UniProtKB/Swiss-Prot annotation:
Family per record: Belongs to the bacterial solute-binding protein 5 family.
Keywords: Periplasm, Signal, Transport
Location, primary (coarse class): periplasm
The keyword Mitochondrion is annotated on this UniProt entry: no
UniProt signal peptide: 1-26
Taxonomic path: Bacteria, Pseudomonadati, Pseudomonadota, Gammaproteobacteria, Enterobacterales
GO cellular component: a single term: ATP-binding cassette (ABC) transporter complex
Protein name in the entry: Glutathione-binding protein GsiB
Cellular compartments annotated: Periplasm
GO molecular function: peptide transmembrane transporter activity
Cited function: Part of the ABC transporter complex GsiABCD involved in glutathione import. Binds glutathione.
Taxonomic source organism: Escherichia coli O1:K1 / APEC
Length: 512
C-alpha cells in the first residue's frame, strides 16, 4: 500500500512538474490591435505611418528617434558633416548580420540609399532621398554620403522610419517584391502575412543586441472598429491596442488588468481644400469654412477630450512651430463670407477621409453637420488604405477627385521641414507627396528652401515663421486638432508604447 501511495505521489509530482515547466516556458506571444490595414512591408514604398511602424519589427535604420523625438544612434555609431554641409560621413557598428545571414556593412548602406535615391524605382518615399548625389562605401564600417545641395535636416532623414536597412541579398533576390519578403537587422523576422487579416513576426535568434527580443512573437492585427479593439483587450484577445476609442477610455481605465496611456503627439488632424478647384479657389470660401467648424465641440464629440484645437499648421511640439489665434466658431460670419464669395445658398461638395475607423467616421459626421448649418452639402466617404492610395496619393492635379480631404500628418523626422514641405510646397502635389490642397505659393517655396540651407537657429526661426504666416493667412486647410495618443495594454506587457508620431516602440517589450 505504501508503495502504491509512493507511485501515485511520483505521478502527481511528475504532472505538477510538467505543468510548471509548460508555464515557465510558455511562449511570450503578443497580439496588437491597430486601427487600419497595412499597405506594404517596404518602408521606402509606404506612405502611411502604420506600415512603417510594423516594418520596425524587421528593420532598423542608421539612426532613430527616442520618445522625446531626439536623435539616437542605431546601426550607426557616429557621424560628421563637412563645413559646406554637403558631405555626411557615417561610422557603422560592426558584427551585425541581416536575418538571411548577409553582413551589415557600408556596401549594404550604399545599396539601400542608391535604390532609394534612384527615381527610376518609383518609390513613394523617393522625395526624402532625391537630394543624395552619391553614396560611397569607404571601408566596411564607413559610409560617405554626398548631397546635391546643403540640406540641414538630412540627418533627420536618416532617422526617418522609411530609411531602413534592407538586406542587399534580399533586394537582389526579390526585387520589386521586397515588400512581401522583408529581411532586415531588426529583432523580429516575418512569420506570416495574411494580407486581409494580420502580420505575424517571430523572434530573430541572431539579433545583435544581447538579451533581446524578449517576446517570441508579435501579431499585428488590423481592427477598424474602435469598440472591437477595446473589447479584444478586455477579453485577452489582444495585449495592446491603438488607437483606443476615446469614449471607452474611462471604462478601460477601471479595468484592473489594463493600463490606459494618454501620451503626447505630433499628429495634426486637418481638412485640406483643393485650391485649384471651385469653389475652394476663392479665399473667402476657405475662410468661411474655417469659421464654420466648432473645434472645441469637435474635441468633445469625436475625441472625448483627448485632443486640443489646432493653433497652427505645425503641432506646437515641433521645433519652429508658430501658434496663432484659434479660428472662432462663427457660422454667421461663415454665411456672410459665402455670400460675398458668390455662394449665398452654399454649394455641394465631397469630403473624403484617409481612414475609415470609428473616430474618423465621427469627425466626418460632425463636419458634415457643421457645414450643413452654413448651407454646404458635403457627401462623405471614409476610405480604406487601398482606396486612399489609388484615389488620393496616386493621382495628379488634373485627374484628382479630391475636394475636401480629412487626414492627419506627423512629421516623423521630428523637424519643421518635414512638417511643412510635403504638405505645402508646390513641387509636392500628389502623386509626388501629400500636398492634397494642391497649394502653391512661390514665397512659401522660397522660405522653405532657404531654411534648409542654414544651420543658424535664428534664421531658421525667421524663415519658417514667414512661411507659416502666409499659409495661415491663405488657409488651404481647415486645421482641426492635435491629438493625444490614447493606447491601452495588458498590465503584464511592459516596454511597449506609442511614439509621438503614432509609430510604435517595442524593442524592450516583455510579458511578465
Amino acid at each position: 500500500m505504501a508503495r502504491a501511495v509512493h507511485r501515485s505521489g511520483l505521478v502527481a509530482l511528475g504532472i505538477a512538474t510538467a505543468l510548471m515547466a509548460s508555464c515557465a516556458f510558455a511562449a511570450k506571444e503578443v497580439v496588437v490591435a491597430v486601427g487600419s490595414n497595412f499597405t506594404t512591408l517596404d518602408p521606402y514604398d509606404a506612405n502611411d505611418t502604420l506600415s512603417q511602424a510594423v516594418a520596425k519589427s524587421f528593420y532598423q535604420g542608421l539612426f532613430g528617434l527616442d520618445k522625446e523625438m531626439k536623435l539616437k544612434n542605431v546601426l550607426a555609431e557616429s557621424y560628421t558633416v563637412s563645413d559646406d554641409g554637403l558631405t555626411y560621413t557615417v561610422k557603422l557598428r560592426e558584427g551585425i548580420k541581416f536575418q538571411d545571414g548577409t553582413d551589415f556593412n557600408a556596401a549594404a548602406v550604399k545599396a539601400n540609399l542608391d535604390r532609394a535615391s534612384d527615381p527610376a524605382n518609383h518609390l513613394k518615399r523617393y522625395n526624402l532621398y532625391k537630394n543624395i548625389a552619391k553614396t560611397e562605401a569607404i571601408d566596411p564600417t564607413t559610409v560617405k554620403i554626398t548631397l546635391k545641395q546643403p540640406f540641414s535636416a538630412f540627418i533627420n532623414i536618416l532617422a526617418h522610419p522609411a530609411t531602413a536597412m534592407i538586406s542587399p541579398a534580399a533586394l537582389e533576390k526579390y526585387g520589386k517584391e521586397i515588400g512581401f519578403h522583408p529581411v532586415g537587422t531588426g529583432p523580429y523576422e516575418l512569420d506570416t502575412w495574411n494580407q486581409t487579416d494580420f502580420v505575424k513576426v517571430k523572434k530573430f535568434a541572431g539579433y545583435w543586441q544581447p538579451g533581446l527580443p524578449k517576446l517570441d512573437s508579435i501579431t499585428w492585427r488590423p481592427v477598424a472598429d474602435n469598440n472591437t479593439r477595446a473589447a479584444m483587450l478586455q477579453t485577452g484577445e489582444a495585449q495592446f491596442a491603438f488607437p483606443i476609442p476615446y469614449e471607452q477610455a474611462a471604462l478601460l481605465e477601471k479595468n484592473k488588468n489594463i493600463e490606459l496611456m494618454a501620451s503626447p503627439s505630433i499628429m495634426q488632424r486637418y481638412i485640406s481644400m483643393n485650391v485649384t478647384q471651385k469653389p475652394f479657389d476663392n479665399p473667402k470660401v476657405r475662410e468661411a469654412l474655417n469659421y464654420a467648424i466648432n473645434r472645441p465641440a469637435l474635441v468633445k464629440v469625436a475625441f472625448a477630450g483627448y485632443a486640443t484645437p489646432a493653433t497652427g499648421v505645425v503641432p506646437p511640439s515641433i521645433a519652429y512651430a508658430q501658434s496663432y489665434k484659434p479660428w472662432p466658431y462663427d457660422p454667421v460670419k461663415a454665411r456672410e463670407l459665402l455670400k460675398e464669395a458668390g455662394y449665398p445658398n452654399g454649394f455641394s461638395t465631397t469630403l473624403w477621409s484617409s481612414h475609415n475607423h470609428s473616430t474618423a467616421q465621427k469627425v466626418l459626421q460632425f463636419t458634415q453637420q457643421q457645414l450643413a448649418q452654413v448651407g454646404i452639402k458635403a457627401q462623405v466617404t471614409a476610405m480604406d488604405a487601398g482606396q486612399r492610395a489609388a484615389e488620393v496619393e496616386g493621382k495628379g492635379q488634373k485627374e484628382s477627385g479630391v475636394r475636401m480631404f480629412y487626414t492627419g500628418w506627423s512629421a516623423s523626422t521630428g523637424e519643421a521641414d518635414w512638417a511643412l514641405s510635403p504638405l505645402f510646397a508646390s513641387q509636392n502635389w500628389p502623386p509626388t507627396l501629400f500636398n492634397t490642397a494642391f497649394y502653391s505659393n512661390k514665397q512659401v517655396d522660397d522660405f522653405l528652401a532657404q531654411a534648409l540651407k542654414t544651420n543658424d537657429p535664428a534664421e531658421k526661426t525667421r524663415l519658417y515663421k514667414a512661411a507659416q504666416d502666409i499659409i495661415w493667412q491663405e488657409s488651404p486647410w481647415i486645421p482641426l486638432v492635435v491629438e493625444k495618443l490614447v493606447s491601452a495594454h495588458s498590465k503584464n506587457l511592459t516596454g511597449f508604447w506609442i511614439m509621438p508620431d503614432t509609430g510604435f516602440s517595442f524593442e524592450d517589450a516583455d510579458l511578465q
